[in-house]
C-alpha cells in the first residue's frame, strides 16, 4: 500500500516541505528562527481574532473596549497580553533571523531574501497600525507623528497624509482604516510566507560553512522537527513569562491614558522594535532628510546582496567581517536606546554618530572587509 502522505495532492506538498525535505546535516540553532516566526504568526492571528471579536474601532469606545476585554472577557487579559508581547517576540525572532542571514550569507539567495525584506516591511506596517488601535495617548500621538512624516514628501505629501487619515487629522476614520489594515495584513503576510518558503525550497537551505551541502543531506523529520521543538519551548517559555509576570514592561505608561488631542505626551516614541529607525529619523534636522534616512535604514537590506565582495559566502571564517557585524549589532542596540531618549544633548550627537556608523558599516566597511579578506587568502609566495 502506498503511503498517503506521498500520494495525496495536499499531503504531498506538506510532506515535501516539512517531512521528507532534504536539509543540510550541519545547520545550527540559528536556523530555528524561521519556524519560530511561523509559530509567532499563528499565535498573533489566533489571539488577534479573539481580540477583534470584542474590540470596537471607534474613537469614543476603542479605549474602553480594550479595558472591557481585560476586565470582563474570559481570559481576555491573557489574550491581550499574549498578543502585545507576541509582537515583541515576533520582532526579536525576526531581527535574529535577518542577522543570521547576513552572518551566513543567506542573502545570496536573492529571491528568498527580497521576499523576506518585503515581509519585514509588511510586518512593520502591521505592527504600526496595531499599536494605534488601543487609542491611548501614545497610540494617538505616535500615529500623528509618523503619519505626519508623509507631509514631508514634495507636492503630494499633504494630500497623501490626508488620504491616510481619511480626514484632516488623525480621527475616527483613521482608526477604522487602521483596524481594517491590521486585520487584513496578517493574511497577506501568510501568503508572502508561502512564497518565501517556495523560493527557499527551490534552492534548499544555506548552512554555516556556506559551501554546497548537496553531498550530505538528512530528512527534515525527525531531526529538525525535534531541534525546532526545543526552540519552540524556549519561545513559549519567554512569551508566557512576559505575558504572565511582566506584561506591560515593553509598553509605554502613557498608553494607560485615553487619547487626548489637546494634551501632547512629553516624549513621543514608538514601540521598542522601531526605535532604531526612529533614532535615525530624529538625528537629521531636516524633515524630508529624516524621512529619506528612515526609509533608507529599513530598505538597506535590499542592496546587501549586491555589496557582497568576499570569495567566501559565510562569515564563519572571516574574522574582520565578523567583528564589523558585531559592531553593527552594538550600533543598532545604541540606536534603539537613543530612540527612547528625549531629543537633547548628548543624545542628539550620539544618535547622529550612530546613524552615520550604521550606513558606513553596511555600505562601505563590510564590502571593503570582504575585499581585504580575499587579498589575505591569496598565497603570497
UniProtKB/Swiss-Prot annotation:
It is a multi-pass membrane protein. Keywords: Electron transport, Heme, Iron, Membrane, Metal-binding, Mitochondrion, Mitochondrion inner membrane, Respiratory chain, Transmembrane, Transmembrane helix, Transport, Ubiquinone. Heme b b566 binds at residues 97, 196. InterPro entries: Cyt_b/b6_C, Cyt_b/b6_C_sf, Cyt_b/b6_N, Cytb/b6-like_sf, Cytochrome_b, Cytochrome_b_C_euk/bac, Cytochrome_b_N_euk/bac, Di-haem_cyt_TM. A ubiquinone binds at residue 201. Heme b b562 binds at residues 83, 182. Its cofactor is heme b. Heme 1 (or BL or b562) is low-potential and absorbs at about 562 nm, and heme 2 (or BH or b566) is high-potential and absorbs at about 566 nm. Component of the ubiquinol-cytochrome c reductase complex (complex III or cytochrome b-c1 complex) that is part of the mitochondrial respiratory chain. The b-c1 complex mediates electron transfer from ubiquinol to cytochrome c. Contributes to the generation of a proton gradient across the mitochondrial membrane that is then used for ATP synthesis. Belongs to the cytochrome b family. This is Cytochrome b. It comes from Planigale maculata sinualis (Common planigale).
Amino acid at each position: 500500500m502506498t503511503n498517503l502522505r506521498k500520494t495525496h495532492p495536499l499531503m504531498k506538498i506538506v510532506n515535501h516541505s516539512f517531512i521528507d525535505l532534504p536539509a543540510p546535516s550541519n545547520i545550527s540553532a540559528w536556523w530555528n528562527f524561521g519556524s519560530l516566526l511561523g509559530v509567532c504568526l499563528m499565535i498573533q492571528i489566533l489571539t488577534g481574532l479573539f481580540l477583534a471579536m470584542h474590540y470596537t474601532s471607534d474613537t469614543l469606545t476603542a479605549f474602553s473596549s480594550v479595558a472591557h476585554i481585560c476586565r470582563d472577557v474570559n481570559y481576555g487579559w491573557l489574550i491581550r497580553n499574549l498578543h502585545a508581547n507576541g509582537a515583541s517576540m515576533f520582532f526579536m525572532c525576526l531581527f535574529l533571523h535577518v542577522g543570521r542571514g547576513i552572518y551566513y550569507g543567506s542573502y545570496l539567495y536573492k529571491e528568498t531574501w527580497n521576499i523576506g525584506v518585503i515581509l519585514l516591511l509588511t510586518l512593520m506596517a502591521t505592527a504600526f497600525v496595531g499599536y494605534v488601535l488601543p487609542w491611548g495617548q501614545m497610540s494617538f500621538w505616535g500615529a500623528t507623528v509618523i503619519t505626519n512624516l508623509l507631509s514631508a514628501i514634495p507636492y503630494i505629501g499633504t494630500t497623501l497624509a490626508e488620504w491616510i487619515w481619511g480626514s484632516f487629522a488623525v480621527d475616527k476614520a483613521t482608526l477604522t482604516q487602521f483596524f481594517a489594515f491590521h486585520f487584513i495584513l496578517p493574511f497577506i503576510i501568510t501568503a508572502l510566507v508561502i512564497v518565501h518558503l517556495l523560493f527557499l525550497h527551490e534552492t534548499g537551505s544555506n548552512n554555516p560553512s556556506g559551501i554546497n551541502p548537496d553531498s550530505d543531506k538528512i530528512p527534515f523529520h525527525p531531526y529538525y522537527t525535534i531541534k525546532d521543538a526545543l526552540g519552540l519551548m524556549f519561545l513559549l517559555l519567554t512569551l508566557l513569562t512576559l505575558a504572565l509576570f511582566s506584561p506591560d514592561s515593553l509598553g509605554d505608561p502613557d498608553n494607560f491614558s485615553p487619547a487626548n488631542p489637546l494634551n501632547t505626551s512629553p516624549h513621543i516614541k514608538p514601540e521598542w522594535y522601531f526605535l532604531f529607525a526612529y533614532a535615525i529619523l530624529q538625528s537629521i534636522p531636516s524633515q524630508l532628510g529624516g524621512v529619506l534616512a528612515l526609509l533608507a535604514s529599513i530598505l538597506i537590506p535590499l542592496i546587501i546582496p549586491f555589496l557582497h565582495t568576499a570569495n567566501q559566502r559565510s562569515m564563519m571564517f572571516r574574522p574582520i567581517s565578523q567583528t564589523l557585524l558585531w559592531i553593527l549589532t552594538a550600533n543598532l542596540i545604541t540606536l534603539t536606546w537613543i530612540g527612547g531618549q528625549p531629543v537633547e544633548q548628548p543624545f542628539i550627537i550620539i544618535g547622529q554618530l550612530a546613524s552615520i556608523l550604521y550606513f558606513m558599516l553596511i555600505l562601505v566597511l563590510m564590502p571593503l572587509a570582504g575585499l581585504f579578506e580575499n587579498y589575505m587568502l591569496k598565497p603570497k609566495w
